[in-house]
């Protein structure tokens, strides 16, 4: 798909400019299939700078090659623009509100700010790093009473800062820290009657046996991540973080993704299916290599954990005993189990009995929905953590 004329000419800024020009030239009432709108687009009006209409068209064909094409051209351009904008501004700090109070300087920074000019004159050839090292040492050598004065000034200004921040948040509630979700992540599970007498055991069981931890704990260090189970699972993972769906609630997002899946042409579904098959093959190879690196004890623990995965999920929901992940009986580790031919297939085979293989990963929509939810919540939590990391604490 890459043209020799376009290689090395397009910067990220140029690509964003191309997408903006395309947006301006797409009709506002665009609701047709993207191919029809793309065919009617006047590329001579899209052209800008050194890039002709034909070059712009060719570059757009390269960009849209990996995009899902069952939507309108407007939606495709918006998704491409969002992905490039996110990539360009990934490491930029969000601009703070102009009225937001400034956090006071710490005791050391106050000392540093006061003394830096003096030491710059004393050591004109020193770099900033060298000056900082000297001033840090000088601050450590300060008498306790002088250091206390800097600390008291900081505490006083910090109290004023906290008062101003409370007033600021009342005036600008959106600018403060994001509110925590009131939706519980998981329902509390029942605790066995036998453990009611031991309060510590009760608390640990509630924490370790929640539905969320059952699925997340079944993962050994270095174990390859499982690929999508089928074409719809792959489509769902890609669609979940799509910019035009982010404003929807989880439930509505599920419904919308399902609706869109029914509109996907058969050739697109076949494309997703082929991708999944390729990922499954890669996963089997990686898993096979990873299993061969395990010690006999680690392999025995892994096989036992995967064999009892389905049982453990059922027991956790009904309040049964849940053993710690990764533990195995001494007798199992002493056996020194080695990987035999076909063992990887046995561990991955969804059709075998649950007592000897992994159960619950492939059977039924409920398992599929649980996997979707885990992947989706990881995407949303990562986005949330990125945005909340720029806020300052009170």
Curated annotation (Swiss-Prot):
Residues 183-197 have a biased composition (Polar residues). One of its GO terms (cellular component) is nucleus. Its main location: cytoplasm. Residues 101-169, 225-291 bind DNA. Residues 167-197, 305-394 are annotated as: Disordered. GO terms for molecular function: DNA binding. The keyword DNA-binding applies. The keyword Lipid biosynthesis does not apply. It is found in: Cytoplasm; Nucleus. Pfam families: HMG_box. InterPro entries: HMG_box_dom, HMG_box_dom_sf, UBF1. PROSITE patterns: HMG_BOX_2. Keywords: Cytoplasm, Developmental protein, DNA-binding, Nucleus, Repeat. GO terms for biological process: blastocyst growth; embryo implantation; regulation of gene expression. Residues 167-180 have a biased composition (Basic residues). This is Upstream-binding factor 1-like protein 1. It comes from Mus musculus (Mouse). The gene is Ubtfl1.
